[in-house]
Regions:
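Acidic, mature catalytic/reactive cores of soluble proteins
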Residues: 1-539
């Protein structure tokens, strides 16, 4: 993160905003000098989240019980891989023994040095058995990472809580209740903790004549001084990253994207021509709402911008939905990586409706996995890259193009949906995995079910590539699901976000006005279901 900010500092900007394209060799922006509204909006939300995340790390315990759960999850992955190997009985028994030992240590250890040291020995025994086995590279990689993880845990304890090392057991026994609890050690109070420990050790040493005890006390005092320096350095680095994120976000001027006449955000700004683009973002279910919300929270654009974003409602199977431009999962759920989908709000119900329609779409296509969104497909551009397009579900989309009838499933869409429908999403992931869509770096970018792009006799073609932004969205969604809405919580911890949050609580309308039905009908003239049912209450 520090190196990323160092690079960003060297990149030319326009009114604090990053250009759309840069040379990775020179960091000079490419022509045309275009500044993207949505990309900078996503960056703004990410910067605020990062800032609060750094401050949260300073305030939270250095050692947490989730460390044991993380190692247990790691061992579970190893066990699953070993179970899939032929003739793996010996390794299966070895990993089972390791799991049993881990459970025993986690129950009674409270993250002590001794517990991790014991786990290190147990891991080494497992690695010895693995070395003599015909296990594949993937198992060996995960096993190597387990060893590194345990060693890093031991190093962290030595760095931040040196009194837990076995050579200081006699000092600990003599100090008794004055030994700090590791669960209470935080970077924000580490100086006080180390000073208190130092005072207790000096007092102990002043009442002892035993040479061994004095030597141990002297060494521990030296280690405490080192620990205080490490903690101070880490605290300072986290604060510097938080400050860098805040500074970069503060420099971003979103008023440059605002069209005063239409009271909307333009697609972007042409810095070469010195004007905003002629196209605008005018739909609420879109990536643009992150930029709109961020600009409103920042105070650089008026709140009315939010209410200028279109909300076009319809009905499918007698249930309400909110139309997007392309019908992608991305349009409904990507902003939820940061913003909370408040229960029964317009955005929450619109997102759930989109998931429902997407699942129904996959069911109608023969029960294939669901999750349609912008992604690569099994077609190549002139320069040999996979074609990228905003694939969507027709029943959710206002817009239709030559790709509207294509069926391309993007696994990252399921991870986005997991934030609202976790059980259904996990079942879908299991189906995708069973079909062979999981590769070395996670799920492949897409699976293409479009007839003209698949080989004879095949049901689909896997698009064997990974895209950084889809992987990033996947990781953030996982963090929200597994870590108590971590990214959403951090984003909303910013005072500006909290002040603007009320727009996210907007409720669905009780009925759809006639003018809105006319607009929808103009885009979707053949959709008789929507045309007939749209006049009914949406709530």
């Amino acid at each position: 993160t520090e190196k990323t900010f160092e690079t960003i500092d060297r990149m030319p900007k326009y009114k604090g905003q990053l250009y759309n394209w840069y040379s990775t060799h020179t960091l000079k922006p490419y022509e045309p000098l275009f500044v993207s509204t949505v990309d900078n909006g996503n960056l703004l939300c990410s910067l605020w989240t990062l800032k609060e995340g750094c401050r949260e790390m300073i305030a939270q315990p250095v050692f947490r019980s989730v460390a044991w759960q993380a190692i247990a999850d790691h061992v579970d992955v190893l066990a699953e891989l070993i179970a899939a190997e032929p003739e793996s009985e010996e390794l299966t028994a070895a990993i089972y023994d390791l799991k049993q030992r881990l459970e025993m240590l986690a129950c009674g250890a409270n993250d002590t040095f001794e517990a991790f040291a014991t786990l290190e020995v147990d891991t080494a025994i497992f690695l010895e058995k693995l070395a003599d086995s015909p296990a594949g590279n993937e198992i060996r990689w995960w096993a190597g990472e387990l060893e590194c993880r345990v060693k890093r845990s031991i190093a962290s304890i030595a760095d931040f809580a040196p009194w837990l090392r076995p050579e200081y057991s006699a000092v600990r026994d003599q100090l008794g209740s004055r030994v700090p609890r590791v669960s209470g050690l935080r970077l924000e109070n580490s100086s006080k903790t180390y000073a208190s420990m130092e005072s207790a050790i000096r007092q102990l040493a002043s009442h002892s004549d035993a040479p061994d005890a004095l030597r141990s006390a002297t060494r521990l005092l030296s280690d405490l001084e080192r620990s205080a320096g490490i903690a101070q350095d880490l605290r300072d680095r986290l604060n510097r990253v938080a400050d860098a994120a805040e500074s970069l976000a503060d420099d971003m001027d979103f008023s440059m994207f605002f069209d005063d006449k239409r009271e909307m955000l333009a697609i972007g700004y042409d810095a070469g021509a010195g004007c905003i683009s002629k196209w605008h973002y005018d739909l609420l279910p879109s990536e643009a709402r992150s930029a709109a919300f961020g600009g409103i929270a920042q105070g650089s654009i008026p709140q009315k911008t939010w209410f200028q974003l279109g909300r076009f409602h319809g009905m499918q199977n007698r249930k309400p939905l909110l139309y997007s431009w392309s019908g992608t999962m991305f349009e409904y759920l990507m902003p939820c990586l940061w913003t909370k989908p408040h229960r029964n709000s317009l955005l929450e119900r619109g997102a759930r409706a989109a998931i429902r329609v997407q699942r129904k779409f996959a069911e109608e296509k023969g029960g294939i996995p669901w999750g349609v969104s912008e992604c690569a497909c099994n077609e190549y551009t002139q320069d040999g890259h996979y074609l990228y397009h905003a694939f969507g579900v027709p029943k959710l989309a206002l817009h239709r193009d030559e790709y509207s009838n294509d069926v391309v499933i993007a696994p990252y869409a399921t991870f986005l949906a997991m934030m609202l429908e976790p059980a259904a999403a996990v079942r879908n992931m299991e189906n995708m995995k069973a079909l062979g869509w999981l590769g070395t770096y996670g799920f492949y970018d897409a699976a293409d079910f479009t007839d003209r792009r698949i080989g004879r006799g095949k049901q689909h073609e896997i698009v064997r590539t990974w895209m950084a932004h889809h992987q990033g969205m996947t990781f953030v969604a996982i963090a929200n699901v597994l870590c108590d809405s971590a990214m959403q919580r951090r984003f909303h911890a910013d005072s500006r976000v909290a002040a603007a949050e009320r727009v996210l609580h907007e409720v669905p309308p009780r009925a759809i006005p006639a003018w809105e039905r006319e607009i929808v009908a103009a885009f979707r003239p053949a959709d008789s279901d929507s045309a007939t049912d749209a006049a009914k209450p949406a709530a």
